[in-house]
From Swiss-Prot:
One of its GO terms (cellular component) is glutamyl-tRNA(Gln) amidotransferase complex. This is Glutamyl-tRNA(Gln) amidotransferase subunit A. The gene is gatA. It comes from Bacillus cereus (strain AH187). Its EC number is 6.3.5.7. The keyword Aminoacyl-tRNA synthetase does not apply. The active site is at 78 (charge relay system), 153 (charge relay system), 177 (acyl-ester intermediate). Keywords: ATP-binding, Ligase, Nucleotide-binding, Protein biosynthesis.
Length: 485
């Protein structure tokens, strides 16, 4: 039995009782990485020397009264979250040798909590993708079946947890990039409310949509991690000054009287029968525990995909303009003048998907098309947000599938961008509205790949979605199943 089969609270007790050491946890992580990483390819960079030194330092503090629950816990960090002195590439050749000189706020908070960073995790380049096949280095595989994708863009973050390489990880979610891979890999992934977690130190893709969040084996562990990284940060102008409650206090298993909304759009066209049936089965479980549910409508959801790709690509076009070979990142050697430097550096440094989205965003922002595309997309975004607010006036949570289908095979969709984009139709509306949502395991498809249940909450009401997710998790055995890698 792996140490990582235990929860954070169980491991904390073992540490305090001196049944295990922090070094044991770190060595468990690196041993598992040595055993499976050649197949999974979840990591881009390991930090073995520093991790082992930190573990030795913390071993001397075991049993101290001020040790928090995350003391000594091994974590992986998505490679678009900067780490001081530890290579941060965004899985792009553009930043292949970038060593940041500061830590992201979330990394600072986790260091203060005495977690240990095992390494940096693979992803779709600059967080643009749904399968991890867009990594500029190599594709991560799904631990449940290596022929299948782990999802994206936080595919490395989800795969590392599912494979037992780390206890938990950080990802980022712009249009579903935590929840979709969590669903595909059979783990728990939360996108917090926009502004709940600082984005300082997150390499920007789409600044009005990006949000850092936790990926874990259980809902309880997820709540521990969010508790540690949440809160106001003066370094992030979009960080919200909203009190962070005690997320653990609500994990009682009680959902009696809970009002659940189920959008008909989330069970309709484009959603596979397996995903639909898994949600209905989950609703029956929650109904048996005293919750009630009704079908509702989010009428503007059908426009979410187009709205998202116009807005996110426009923001990416602006954010990624800084990578030009002048200040940092790679620099093309094939240069005769300044224009050559810009053009050749960007052509050689960016992958196809990143260039595709930059071109789309540049077009949407160009004069003559701005009102027709970008401005109209912003207006539709407001309508989508209003739809959520209207539903939440009468219901506590919204529930539906996380993804239309289970994971697909490697290479199956990578050459068809529109089909690939459609994998995010159920997660994108949440980002556009800025509300929180969690994906928890809820069954398996005919291909024996995991399915995820998405629970969406009101702004800054992560506590309620944790309560519902935990109650469902404890009433079922989906979370106890592990990839047999």
């Amino acid at each position: 039995m792996s140490l990582f089969d235990h929860s954070v609270s169980e491991l904390h007790k073992k540490l305090n009782n001196k049944e295990i050491s922090v070094t044991d946890l770190v060595e468990e992580s690196y041993k598992r990485i040595a055993d499976v990483e050649d197949n999974v390819k979840a990591f881009l960079t390991l930090d073995e020397e520093n991790a082992r030194a930190k573990a030795k330092e913390l071993d001397a503090k075991i049993g101290a009264e001020d040790n928090g629950l995350l003391f000594g816990m091994p974590i992986g960090v998505k490679d678009n979250i900067v780490t001081n002195g530890l290579r941060t590439t965004c899985a792009s050749k553009m930043l292949a040798n970038f060593d940041p000189i500061y830590d992201a706020t979330v990394v600072q908070k986790l260091k203060a909590a005495d977690t240990i960073t095992i390494g940096k995790l693979n992803m779709d380049e600059f967080a643009m993708g749904s399968s991890n096949e867009n990594s500029g280095f190599y594709a991560t595989k799904n631990p449940w079946n290596l022929d299948y994708v782990p999802g994206g863009s936080s595919g490395g973050s989800a795969a590392a947890v599912a494979a037992g390489e780390v206890l938990f990880s950080l990802g980022s979610d712009t249009g579903g990039s935590i929840r979709q891979p969590a669903a595909y890999c059979g783990v728990v992934g939360l996108k917090p409310t926009y502004g709940r977690v600082s984005r300082y130190g997150l390499v920007a893709f789409a600044s009005s949509l990006d949000q850092i969040g936790p990926i874990t084996r259980t809902v309880e562990d997820n709540a521990y991690l969010l508790q540690a990284i949440s809160g106001l940060d003066r370094m992030d102008a979009t960080s919200a000054n909203v009190e962070v409650g005690n997320y653990l206090a609500g994990l009682t298993g009680d959902v009696k009287g809970l009002r659940i909304a189920v959008p008909k759009e989330y069970l309709g066209e484009g959603v596979g029968e397996e995903a639909r049936e898994s949600v209905l089965a989950a609703l029956k479980v929650l109904e048996g525990m005293g919750a009630t549910w009704e079908e509702v409508s989010l009428p503007h959801s059908k426009y979410a995909l187009a709205t998202y790709y116009l807005l996110s690509s426009s923001e990416a076009s602006a954010n990624l303009s800084r990578f030009d070979g002048v200040r940092y990142g790679v620099r093309s050697d094939n240069v005769n003048n300044l224009m050559d430097l810009y053009k050749n550096t960007r052509s050689e440094g960016f992958g196809d998907e990143v260039k595709r989205r930059i071109m789309l965003g540049t077009f949407a922002l160009s004069s003559g098309y701005y009102d027709a595309y970008y401005k109209k997309a912003q207006q539709v975004r407001t309508l989508i947000k209003n739809d959520f607010e209207n539903v939440f006036a009468n219901y506590d949570v919204i529930i539906g599938p996380t993804t239309p289908t289970p994971a697909f095979k490697v290479g199956e969709k990578v050459d068809d961008p529109m089909t690939m984009y459609a994998n995010d139709i159920l997660t994108i509306p949440v980002n556009l509205a800025g509300v929180p949502a969690i994906s928890v395991p809820c069954g398996f498809g005919a291909n024996n790949m995991p399915l995820g249940l998405q629970i969406i909450g009101k702004h800054f009401d992560e506590a309620t979605i944790y309560r519902v997710a935990h109650a469902f998790e404890q009433a079922t055995d989906h979370h106890t199943k592990k990839a047999s890698l």
